[in-house]
């Protein structure tokens, strides 16, 4: 599909929701509805030296811009590809002596781009950036104070001699970024490393049980011929069969929250009341709060309070890097929850998630696999069957089972995850390619295991001993 092609989607009046996009033809699960390069994007301050400012891949030994000494790139190819975006920024950073925060940098990039292209980067862009909603009038007092501080910082950063902007104009851009900024992940999808503005994507309305998902395609800058290079872009992909004329939707928040909590988050950040079917009917809230049959109300209340308190302690210990204490706290919390909270209860799932992650890090794979299995079973009952977060969780659980020597279970999970991520990410994404390699490897090992179990264990032990898992 050509980047920016909007033949599969069209703008329409979505009633109370305002504008929206609808399918102009029947779409299949995994089909790319449209792709869109960023109007502007920046790397987060905390990753400025660890992530390429062009393709947003995270890696070691990046090359630093010799002029501003702030921007970092994979190589000269990425630096050249990003020069149009970085040129004005580079001069501004040199002028004030340091780079401002990510929101100020993104606002400046947006305005530089507007000056260059009057807010429309291409013919396929359905709306100009300055027409996007800013919701500045809806911001609470604390957010307005922060906005004012950002505007003042911006005025000091904006180059002298350029077109002057009023505080209201700049506030409008900051408001647009706050409401419409899309978080960008690294090439493994494991870490949020930046934020960008994608005007056409901003037209896709929210649904807690959406029919589409968005992923970042980091592009290809490694081909020998520059004619084969492709730019960084988002892809809107169908999660299921979508008939012609049906509204396209994505989820702005993680579904793994009670409907009231999702509605609160959406109201606070995006300033609208969610009335989707899952919120209106409180769908799956019963599972997210499920208790073991026969549990008394006062016991449930006690365990719920205990779990919330322990989750705070667990997070504190994790931030401090005291992972053995994290495991101890998780074990105590799960023991308290046993026979009271069901495995689909959100509080239990959060403890299971941390426990499996930390135990895997500590290479206690058998115990980690047990927790991961329970976590995945709970997730499967709650998430959309093609949810990307579900796919990633099953993938990690599969790898954990493989490390634990549970080859058959690990292979089965990896195959399940592969099926989901083929829909959400497509066959060419780095995550899917890695998963395909794992799937092939575990399939081969499973075959070897069934043919010669003793020989397999001997070979595997030697391999793991020579290549310890980090």
Question: What spans do the regions from the language model cover?
Answer:
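Short alpha-helical interaction motifs and adjacent low-complexity tails used for partner binding
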Residues: 1-470
């Amino acid at each position: 599909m050509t980047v920016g092609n909007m033949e599969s989607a069209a703008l329409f009046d979505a009633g109370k929701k305002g504008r929206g996009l609808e399918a102009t033809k029947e779409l299949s699960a995994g089909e790319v509805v449209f792709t869109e390069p960023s109007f502007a994007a920046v790397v987060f301050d905390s990753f400025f030296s660890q992530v390429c400012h062009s393709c947003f891949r995270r890696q070691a030994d990046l090359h630093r811009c010799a002029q501003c000494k702030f921007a970092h790139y994979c190589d000269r190819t990425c630096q050249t590809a990003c020069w149009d975006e970085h040129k004005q920024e580079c001069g501004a950073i040199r002028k004030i002596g340091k780079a401002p925060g990510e929101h100020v940098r993104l606002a400046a990039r947006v305005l530089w781009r507007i000056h260059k292209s009057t807010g429309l980067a291409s013919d396929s862009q359905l709306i100009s950036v300055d027409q996007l909603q800013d919701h500045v009038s809806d911001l609470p007092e604390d957010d307005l104070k922060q906005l004012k501080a950002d505007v003042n910082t911006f005025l000091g950063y904006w180059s002298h001699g350029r077109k002057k902007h009023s505080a209201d104009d700049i506030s409008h851009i900051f408001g647009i970024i706050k409401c419409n900024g899309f978080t960008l992940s690294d090439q493994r999808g494991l870490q949020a490393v930046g934020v960008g503005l994608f005007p056409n994507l901003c037209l896709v309305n929210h649904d807690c049980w959406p029919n589409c998902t968005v992923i970042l395609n980091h592009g290809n800058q490694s081909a020998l011929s520059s004619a084969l290079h492709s730019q960084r872009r988002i892809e809107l992909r169908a999660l299921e069969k979508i008939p012609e004329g049906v509204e396209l939707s994505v989820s702005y928040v993680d579904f793994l929250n009670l409907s009231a909590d999702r509605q609160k988050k959406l109201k606070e950040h995006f300033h609208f009341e969610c009335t989707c079917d899952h919120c209106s009917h409180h769908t799956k809230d019963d599972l997210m709060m499920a208790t073991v049959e026969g549990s008394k109300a006062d016991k449930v209340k006690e365990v719920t309070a205990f779990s919330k308190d322990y989750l705070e302690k667990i997070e504190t210990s994790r931030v401090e890097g005291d992972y053995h204490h994290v495991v101890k706290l998780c074990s105590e919390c799960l023991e308290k929850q046993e026979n009271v909270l069901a495995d689909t209860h959100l509080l239990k799932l959060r403890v299971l998630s941390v426990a499996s992650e930390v135990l895997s890090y500590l290479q206690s794979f058998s115990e980690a696999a047990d927790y991961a299995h329970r976590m995945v079973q709970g997730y499967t009952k709650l998430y959309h069957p093609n949810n990307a977060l579900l796919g990633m969780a099953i993938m990690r659980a599969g790898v954990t089972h493989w490390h634990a020597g549970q080859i058959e279970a690990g292979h089965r999970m990896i195959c399940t995850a592969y099926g989901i991520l083929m829909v959400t990410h497509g066959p060419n994404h780095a995550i899917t390619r890695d998963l395909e390699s794992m799937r092939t490897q575990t399939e081969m090992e499973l075959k070897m295991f069934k043919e010669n179990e003793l020989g397999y264990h001997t070979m595997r032990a030697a391999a793991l001993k020579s290549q310890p898992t980090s």
